Amino acid sequence: DYSWQIVDGGDVRAAGPFALAFSGGHHATIHRSIPIVDNVGVFVNETLYYPGDSFTVPPGAVEVLAVPASAPWLKIGEVMDYLDTVRPRRAFPTHERVNSDAGNAMANARITAVVEAHGGSVTVLQPGE
């Protein structure tokens, strides 16, 4: 059994040893015909930030960013702009399973180029990691 709570951008919660700060509020637009739903990003212990299905800029400096790499709501240029804004010290791609191997190689190269240009590093996780 797990308990759960609905959260909004600006909410702060604790879950065991984790301090969770939520930001944002809306899913990125997929298409004008598809209603926009709620979405929040989460900052874990002021270290790891995961924006969910959006490009919400986190409320502080980011040590580790779980960066969306592919999804029906994004294009790689937007990912690159987001990385230019957030400038994480470390990043790892998420949302990548919809890509082919060639698509992942292209996205990972673009993500790595931007993160490294700002002095950071990228780790590409494999399934199961």
Question: What are these model-predicted stretches?
Answer:
Residues S3-A19, R90-E129:
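Binuclear metal-ion centers of metallo-dependent hydrolases, dominated by the metallo-beta-lactamase
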Residues H27-A28, S70-A71, R97-A102:
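Short histidine/acidic/glycine/proline-rich micro-motifs that form metal-
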Residues I36-V37, I76, M80-D81, A105-I111:
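Charged helix-capping and loop-helix junction motifs
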Residues I76-E96:
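Proline-aspartate-enriched helix->loop->beta-strand connector
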